[in-house]
Amino acid sequence: MQLEQSPLVAQHRALDANLVEFGGWEMPIAYPSGTVAEHLACRHGAAMFDVSHLGSVRIEGEGAFDRLQATFTNDLNKVAPGRAQYTHLLDAADASVLDDIIIWWHPRADGEPDVFDVMPNASNTDDVVAAIGGVEATRTRAVIAVQGPEAKTQLAAVFPAAAAVGRFRVAICEWNGTNCTVGGTGYTGEPGVEIAVPVDAAPALWEAIVAAGITPAGLGARDTLRLESGLPLHGQELGAGITSLQADLAWVVAWNKPAFTGRDAALAEREAGVARRLFGITVEGRRPARTGCAISINGKVVGEVTSGNFSPVLGHAIALGFLPPETSEGQAVSIDVRGKELIGRIVRPPFV
């Protein structure tokens, strides 16, 4: 299968990135500095990520608001033009989370038409287009995420308008004569922005941000950062057979909205109660539990790990997993990793 390539692939190769397949795209998993160094750069300074593999669906004009409102779980009436919102697309039959999505609602003047950029996970873009219509715009732009406690300070030297965009705000910002859409969003648990830049201008913007001293980081660090922050990954904590309630994301569902796809099934589960719920686990030692490892309480297998890895900040392993809903914080668990028992304790994410 021919992999999709980021508009920034030449820049990654010039930096000697380790490129791997991810969601049908050839993307950097790490640079020579390594995942741990990249992770810590984001936690303590600033890092930049190419996330151009994320989908982008443009939906605009009359009826756009109503279509999104009738499809996704969250309530767009809670926000306004110039804001971003996290939401879910559910399966109508069982309320499984088909995708978790960020919506960027472009700023507009009174009387101007609404413009939304709906950003699904890479492998789910076609399904989202089928659900809401619109025009796929993934290949018209690159997306550069600049994240970390020093991200905005360092980015301001290169792109001050983008650095000024607030958390969950959306703005159109000009860089060297090119309009970029900038959202105060991310997937690391740190402050920062994501910049959607037209393909032709993307390499120059990437190189300018690198030259400002911000550390390039791969998808390996992005994954360990989101895990430390307790953020779900579609295909692991979300997906077929996993609902918003089970993933401990009931806040993403606007229960008072009169209609959205999967509403009846979601309400039925809320009424009946969930059979399992997502928990965090701190694990003794550095060895990580991996997806699918069995979790036991008092010698009985009661669940399994969905994500696990070493936490560079904490210095030991952490995990997420589904367990019975009555499981309590502080409870001791054991995890079977290829016949070796790891000892852990239940916590409520985030881990850091």
Set out the residue ranges of the language-model regions.
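Acidic active-site catalytic centers that drive phospho-/nucleotidyl reactions
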Residues: 50, 100, 194
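Conserved, structured C-terminal
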Residues: 1-23, 27-30, 105-352
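Short, charge-rich binding segments
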Residues: 78-81, 89-96, 101-112, 121, ...
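Short coil/turn segments at secondary-structure boundaries
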Residues: 55, 59, 93, 116-123
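Acidic, proline/glycine-enriched N-terminal capping motif
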Residues: 1-89, 96, 220
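Internal amphipathic helical hairpin motif
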Residues: 62-99, 149-178
